[in-house]
């Protein structure tokens, strides 16, 4: 009789635990811990926890390691943040991660790109800063595609020399330290609030808080209206859970902490972007000059 009671109790606790178990959704970081991707992944993970998820941040550091992780049966569904520039860079290095209806969950945001100089520079516009120069060094994250400044050098007669850094945080440090003349980076809260730099132009089609659009300064540059679109890529999410995950990620985007983050950096939240995959491929097409066939 005692064994029967113990068995019933064990079954009861097993059922109860199953019913009340937290849903799992990890946030994977296919890069290092010094850039925006890591900070944003922690922001997303915390918001998921607020929604009742069991969520951990898993750092895989690069595309190859990330593919290996995705192939494992970890028993923990997840997502990772991936932007248009990173996709193109991964493809150029032969690290193909399929983007399709199954893997592309939804857009996190569309973010402006910006050009910044040190605050101690006397110039208050990019044209003023470039005036009289024959060469300018431009810091950027190493994940950007090759040749992005070729058109600028050709059209302005000024040699734009690219200097790569490992992550946007180190790019900013490089500018402040005087390692480069200017930087081209994502327009985020970090750049906006930093008193040691001034960001003077953006990829928006309209001025942003007094900053001129690139299209006004560099009217023929192929990236003058191109920002960065970042989306949630599914990792081992069961098909029957996908719709719930997508809906919950929309809640994450509109949560106070995440919405505030996006608003302060003048980003467009994914919940306001229509035809999201089409928007993704449109930017990829611009970045690659319509040469990228692989999807």
Regions found by a protein language model. Name each.
Residues 23-25, 50, 154-158, 240-295:
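An extracytoplasmic/periplasmic, membrane-proximal ligand-sensing/linker region
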Residues 8-9, 19:
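Cleavable N-terminal signal peptides
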Residues 117-135:
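Flexible hinge/capping segments at coil-to-helix
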Residues 110, 189-254:
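C-terminal lobe and pocket-closing loops
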Residues 1-8:
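Bacterial N-terminal signal peptides that target proteins for export
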Residues 139-150:
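Secondary-structure junction motif
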Residues 21-102, 144-145, 156-184, 189-193, ...:
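N-terminal (or domain-start) structured segment
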Residues 77-79, 95-114, 137, 219-222:
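A structural signal for short loop-to-beta-strand junctions that line the ligand-binding cleft
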């Amino acid at each position: 009789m005692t064994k029967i009671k113990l068995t019933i109790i064990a079954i009861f606790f097993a059922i109860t635990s199953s019913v009340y178990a937290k849903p799992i959704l990890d946030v994977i970081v296919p890069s290092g811990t010094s850039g925006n991707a890591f900070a944003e992944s922690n922001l997303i993970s915390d918001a998921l926890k607020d929604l009742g998820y069991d969520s951990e941040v898993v750092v895989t550091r690069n595309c190859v390691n990330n593919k290996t992780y995705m192939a494992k049966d970890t028993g923990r569904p997840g997502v990772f943040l991936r932007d248009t520039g990173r996709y193109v860079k991964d493809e150029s290095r032969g690290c193909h991660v399929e983007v399709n209806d199954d893997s592309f969950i939804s857009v996190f945001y569309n973010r402006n790109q910006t050009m910044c100089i040190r605050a101690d520079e006397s110039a208050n516009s990019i044209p003023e800063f470039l005036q009289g120069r024959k060469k300018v060094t431009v810091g950027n994250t190493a994940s950007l595609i090759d040749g992005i400044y070729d058109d600028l050098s050709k059209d302005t007669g000024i040699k734009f020399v690219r200097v790569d850094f490992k992550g946007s945080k180190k790019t900013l440090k490089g500018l402040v330290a005087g390692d480069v003349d200017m930087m081209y980076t994502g327009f985020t809260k970090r750049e906006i609030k930093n008193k040691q730099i001034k960001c003077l132009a953006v990829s928006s089609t309209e001025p942003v808080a007094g900053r001129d659009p690139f299209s006004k300064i560099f009217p023929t540059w192929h990236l003058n209206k191109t920002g960065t679109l970042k989306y949630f890529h599914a990792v081992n999410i069961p098909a029957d859970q996908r719709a719930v995950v997508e809906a919950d990620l929309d809640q994450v985007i509109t949560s106070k902490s995440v919405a505030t983050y996006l608003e302060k950096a003048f980003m467009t939240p994914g919940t306001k972007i229509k035809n999201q995959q089409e928007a993704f491929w449109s930017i990829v097409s611009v970045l690659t000059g319509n040469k990228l066939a692989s999807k």
